[in-house]
Amino acid sequence: MKQSEIKDLSAAELQEKLSQTKKVYADLKMAHAISPIANPLRIRSVRRTVARLATELTKRELQ
């Protein structure tokens, strides 16, 4: 998810997207721990998306 897409979301949508993305990240980590997944770089991508969403949410709360 690109930064411009994240900025277009409302605060409620950010919260929802963040929880969904965290669940995907946890599922990927679990799947990779059990047996290596086909594309392990997806874990990094999802982790960075979680960080982007959390950063934007915090930024909005501070304003």
From Swiss-Prot:
Q: Which of UniProt's keywords are assigned here?
A: Ribonucleoprotein, Ribosomal protein
**Any one of the GO BP annotations:** translation
What is a GO molecular function of this protein? Answer: structural constituent of ribosome
Query: Entry's InterPro entries?
Result: Ribosomal_uL29, Ribosomal_uL29_CS, Ribosomal_uL29_sf
Task: Identify the Pfam families for this entry.
Answer: Ribosomal_L29
Lineage, top-rank taxon, reads: Bacteria
Gene Ontology CC: one annotated term: ribosome
Q: Which cysteines are joined by disulfide bonds?
A: none
Return the PROSITE patterns for the record: RIBOSOMAL_L29
Q: Which CDD domains match?
A: Ribosomal_L29_HIP
Q: Which family does it belong to?
A: Belongs to the universal ribosomal protein uL29 family.
Protein name as catalogued: Large ribosomal subunit protein uL29
Please give the organism: Flavobacterium johnsoniae (strain ATCC 17061 / DSM 2064 / JCM 8514 / BCRC 14874 / CCUG 350202 / NBRC 14942 / NCIMB 11054 / UW101)
